[in-house]
Amino acid sequence: MKLITFTVPCYNSAAYMDHCIETLLTAGEDAEIILVDDGSKDDTGKIADAYAEKYPTIVRVIHQENGGHGEAVNTGIRNATGLYFKVVDSDDWVDLDAYRKILDKLREISGGDRVLDMFIANYVYEKEGVKHKKVMRCSNLPKDRIFTWKEAGHFHKGQYILMHSVIYRTKLLVECGLELPKHTF
């Protein structure tokens, strides 16, 4: 079993998806990367297929009619085989140093006797051409340890957890029957 499945929803992503995929590939055989071509009209599907051909033990491609971001995520969940699951949008990428630390921590936790349902990390929202980066921080959550929701306390107004900052235990998502609405982001 792979350590983590990354689902990458792709819609007309040909111009920028390479950067996303290349950063995810640095995990090597620990990762399963599912590229969901959500009915793209450009070369997204061809690019995705080329990655699957070049990295057959890591990359899988699913071509589907356009169902929107939510349906692409649902497709990823239904097809994920990794112990953990994360969505990375095709116009996003991972910071390699942070990525290595997260993978090391997931390896460490997965070898223990406790079950981890969610792994939360800070997320940087960086828009091309904008000078200031917005860092989404979960500052009131305990750091560097496993904790319960009771320990997490309450979130402050304007504070929330983005899907982009969470890694889920795949089995949890499957067992709870998570289904995102079609055509939503």
What spans do the regions from the language model cover?
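Short, well-formed alpha-helical segments that are part of the catalytic scaffolds
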Residues: N12-T26
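A conserved acidic beta->alpha catalytic loop
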Residues: T23, D37-K46, G67-G68
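Short beta-strand/loop segment that forms part of the nucleotide-sugar
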Residues: A31-G39, R60-E65, D89-S90
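Acidic donor-binding/catalytic loop of UDP-sugar-dependent glycosyltransferases
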Residues: D43, D92-K105
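Glycine-rich, basic loop-to-helix element that forms the pyrophosphate-binding segment
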Residues: Q64-A80
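Short aromatic/hydrophobic "clamp" motif used to bind/position activated sugar donors
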Residues: F85
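Conserved donor NDP-sugar-binding/catalytic core segment of glycosyltransferases
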Residues: R100-K134
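Conserved nucleotide-sugar donor-binding catalytic segment
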Residues: W149-F185
